[in-house]
Amino acid sequence: MEPTFNKMTAAGYHAIEQEIEDLKQQRPERIRILAAAAALGDRSENAEYSSAKRDLGRLESRLRYLNKQLQYAQIVQPADNDQLDIGKFVTIEFLDDHDQITYQLVGKQEANLEQQKISFTSPIGQALANHTVDDVVTVNAPNGAYQVKVIAVKRA
């Protein structure tokens, strides 16, 4: 079976690398806390030991997950054209209320609505992919379809 690659921007890849480094720096302290809790004696009723073991397990699990993300990462460089793809910024106008908003189309690991980053696999991301300025696009969202107009497309 072919592995599925995770498309992402270079910035998203570097953010994962940074999180891995941060977690690796936290690991020795978590191990020290676990060892200190284990030294307190009976582990069957040692809440500090159980908590420290759980914390270290979460850290190790997150590291494995992030390393897999990098292992199967495919960094996408935005094409030098007017079509919307990963890494580019798009300004859209919602045709029902004429509100405008600018998003960056990113890989699914990078999506963050608070930062106006939408995944290329989201309903709106899929609908906008490969469209250009002045295109009217129908977005098939879980709560119903709506239309948006592409106002601008810019490279990052």
Swiss-Prot record:
InterPro entries for the chain: GreA/GreB_C_sf (IPR036953), TF_GreA/GreB_CS (IPR018151), Tscrpt_elong_fac_GreA (IPR006359), Tscrpt_elong_fac_GreA/B (IPR028624), Tscrpt_elong_fac_GreA/B_C (IPR001437), Tscrpt_elong_fac_GreA/B_fam (IPR023459), Tscrpt_elong_fac_GreA/B_N (IPR022691), Tscrpt_elong_fac_GreA/B_N_sf (IPR036805)
Molecular function terms, GO-annotated: DNA binding; RNA polymerase binding
Keywords attached to this entry: Coiled coil, DNA-binding, Transcription, Transcription regulation
Coiled coil: 43-74
Pfam families to which the protein is assigned, alphabetical: GreA_GreB, GreA_GreB_N
Listed GO biological process terms: DNA-templated transcription elongation; regulation of DNA-templated transcription elongation
Domain of life: Bacteria
Keyword Oxidoreductase appears in the UniProt entry: no
PANTHER family: TRANSCRIPTION ELONGATION FACTOR GREA (PTHR30437:SF4)
Family: Belongs to the GreA/GreB family.
Function of the protein: Necessary for efficient RNA polymerase transcription elongation past template-encoded arresting sites. The arresting sites in DNA have the property of trapping a certain fraction of elongating RNA polymerases that pass through, resulting in locked ternary complexes. Cleavage of the nascent transcript by cleavage factors such as GreA or GreB allows the resumption of elongation from the new 3'terminus. GreA releases sequences of 2 to 3 nucleotides.
Annotated protein name in UniProt: Transcription elongation factor GreA 1
Lineage: Bacteria, Bacillati, Bacillota, Bacilli, Lactobacillales
